[in-house]
Design a protein with these regions (language model features):
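Hot-dog-fold acyl-thioester-processing enzymes
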Residues: 1-86, 151-152
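HotDog/MaoC-like acyl-thioester-processing domains
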Residues: 1-11, 92-101, 105-152
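Conserved interaction-surface patches within small, structured recognition/assembly domains
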Residues: 88-90
């Protein structure tokens, strides 16, 4: 499904994204390694069993953030985004573990025309990710530069 143009976004609309993704150990190890993050809470099962309240490794929050936004792309900005302008209020209220299946929802909270780019507009979203038990695991506010509909 192609993304929406600036004019097609309505403030207050909530997208419940159909695509879900089960997070694997390979995802976590790959992401942590690729980003040079050697933290034991992501990579060392024995350390986590003995020294953390979770008793197991937690998924790297950078991966969780990227997955949450990625799950939204097909319904919202696929092919119509020019780029991200920024993210605010990034939160991880609960951990993600290997084997958790995440789903996401996106709310449009603001939109405005770009003063410097007449063929584009700015849309602000709140993304939320939930695990298989509907527990909130991640949330952020994201501003994106979105194409306007081409002139007929």
């Amino acid at each position: 499904m192609p993304g929406l143009y600036f004019e097609e976004f309505e403030v207050g609309r909530v997208f419940n994204h159909a695509i879900r993704r089960t997070v694997t150990e390979a995802d976590n190890v790959w992401y942590s390694t690729a980003t040079c993050n050697p933290a034991a809470i992501h990579l060392d099962e024995e350390y986590c069993r003995e020294h953390t309240e979770f008793g197991q490794r937690i998924v790297n929050s950078g991966f969780t953030l990227g997955l949450m936004i990625g799950l939204s792309v097909g319904d919202t900005t696929l092919g119509t985004t020019v780029g991200n302008l920024g993210m605010d209020e990034v939160r991880f209220p609960n951990p993600v573990f290997h084997g958790d299946t995440l789903r996401a929802e996106t709310e449009v909270i603001e939109k405005r025309e770009s003063r410097s780019r007449p063929t584009q507009g700015i849309v602000t979203f709140v993304h939320r990710a939930f695990n298989q038990r509907s527990v909130l695991v991640s949330q952020c506010k994201r501003a994106a530069l979105i194409l306007r509909k081409p002139a007929p």
